[in-house]
């Protein structure tokens, strides 16, 4: 028995010695080759990572190729991304070793919660899948079904992030995510979209719009981000947009309006920035716009009005209750309705050119110009005296009473013909 024990001890000692020698040889070889100039590296992800999980070197196999032809596995290297993103099915990270870099695609492990078939005309062609990390991901290819008034199959599900894969080509996403107060983000929208009415309406925690400038077929964005009270940043409006009524209404944290100058068919921006109380500049309005009613109603931090397009027709309440507004924009002859356009603009002063003879100009300056500074009315309108009297402010005057009287008489003759 004692002999057997001694034999085992000897065997284990020999094995330990062999292992030690092999490790020593391996360490010596590694130390030697690791000093050689690196030609390139290859990396493979061999681990598993969940959303937001920190990455470690043990998750990667990194193979090093030297200029002398040696090949070995790197034991220490730098990983560009320290942890996996919270959303998505994969991400890219860079591996760096001795000045050489390579990019590795890392899959993210998520658990499926529920899945819906929403393709059109074949339902199975597009899948809407909700995962345990809050992703609502659209995969497959082709168009999707239309859903009346936001009656989507995921309406009552819990999700916080929306992802569209490149092959998805929906044309209508009206009210798809309306009222989801937990939604925090959405990646690039499909280029195929034509109508996005109320798509993100009431998504109170959305801070940034998805990229949609590339949506060259998008025509309708009415109420699209209305009530997104955390929204701070927006993509420019695509060239194709025609209707944008209430698109950013009550986005109280939006300080800069999206660029609209690339559009060439935009006709209505009724209430587009209504209630955007943090907006500090009125954006340039495209020449194609005809309806600007309530466009900036209640925007209390705008100081200068943006020029009206020369063909605009409706500017009723366009800048009503903009209490900080100091400089008004000239009212073109094309205007049919300018009722309450500058009503409640208490800080207005300087000059206001009015060139329309429309009868719908009641309350144009009601409760305005009350700060003690003078606003002088001028222009080709025959109704300057009416507008002055209707304002009820002693600080509203006529710049050239003689011209104003001539224009008034001219208008009277035209009306009597």
Please describe what each predicted stretch is.
Residues 1-14:
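N-terminal Sec-pathway targeting helices
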Residues 21-34:
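Sec-dependent signal peptide cleavage junction
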Residues 34-71:
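Solvent-exposed, low-complexity, repeat-rich "mucin-like" stalks and linkers
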Residues 47-48, 69-104, 108-110:
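Serine/threonine-rich, repeat-prone extracellular segments and beta-strand-based repeat modules
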Residues 81, 135-142, 157-171, 181-195, ...:
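Structural signature of tandem-repeat unit edges
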Residues 113-161:
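N-terminal segments that cap or nucleate solenoid repeat domains
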């Amino acid at each position: 028995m004692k002999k057997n024990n001694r034999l085992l001890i000897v065997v284990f000692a020999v094995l330990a010695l062999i292992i030690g020698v092999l490790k020593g040889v391996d360490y010596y070889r590694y130390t030697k080759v690791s000093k050689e100039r690196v030609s390139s590296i290859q990396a493979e992800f061999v681990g598993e990572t969940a959303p937001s999980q920190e990455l470690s070197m043990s998750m990667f196999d990194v193979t090093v190729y030297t200029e002398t032809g040696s090949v070995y596995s790197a034991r220490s290297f730098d990983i560009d991304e320290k942890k996996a993103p919270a959303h998505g099915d994969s991400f890219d990270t860079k591996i760096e070793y001795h000045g050489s870099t390579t990019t590795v695609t890392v899959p993210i492990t998520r658990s499926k919660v529920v899945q819906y078939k929403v393709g059109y005309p074949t339902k199975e062609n597009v899948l809407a899948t909700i995962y345990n990390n809050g992703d609502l991901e659209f995969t497959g290819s082709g168009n999707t079904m239309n859903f009346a008034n936001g009656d989507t199959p995921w309406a009552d599900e819990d999700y916080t992030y929306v992802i569209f894969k490149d092959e998805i080509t929906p044309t209508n996403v009206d009210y798809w995510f309306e009222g989801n107060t937990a939604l925090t983000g959405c990646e690039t929208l499909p280029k195929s979209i034509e109508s996005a009415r109320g798509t993100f309406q009431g998504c109170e925690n959305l801070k940034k719009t998805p990229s949609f400038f590339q949506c060259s077929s998008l025509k309708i964005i009415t109420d699209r981000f209305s009530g997104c009270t955390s929204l701070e940043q927006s993509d420019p409006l695509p060239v194709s947009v025609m209707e944008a009524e209430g698109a950013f209404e009550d986005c109280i944290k939006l300080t800069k309006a999206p660029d609209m100058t690339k559009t060439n068919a935009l006709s209505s921006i009724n209430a587009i920035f209504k209630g955007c109380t943090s907006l500090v500049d009125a954006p340039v309005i495209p020449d194609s716009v005809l309806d600007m009613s309530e466009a900036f109603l209640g925007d209390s931090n705008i100081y200068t009005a943006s020029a009206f397009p020369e063909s605009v027709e409706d500017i009723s309440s366009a800048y009503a209750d903009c209490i900080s507004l100091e400089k008004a924009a000239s009212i073109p002859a094309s205007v049919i309705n300018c009722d309450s356009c500058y009503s409640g603009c208490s800080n207005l002063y300087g000059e206001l050119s009015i060139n329309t003879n429309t009868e719908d100009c009641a309350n144009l300056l009601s409760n305005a110009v009350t700060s003690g500074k003078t606003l002088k009315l001028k222009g080709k309108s025959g109704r300057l005296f009416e507008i002055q009297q209707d304002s009820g402010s002693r600080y509203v005057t006529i710049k050239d009473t003689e011209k104003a009287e001539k224009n008034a008489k001219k208008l009277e003759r035209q009306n009597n013909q």
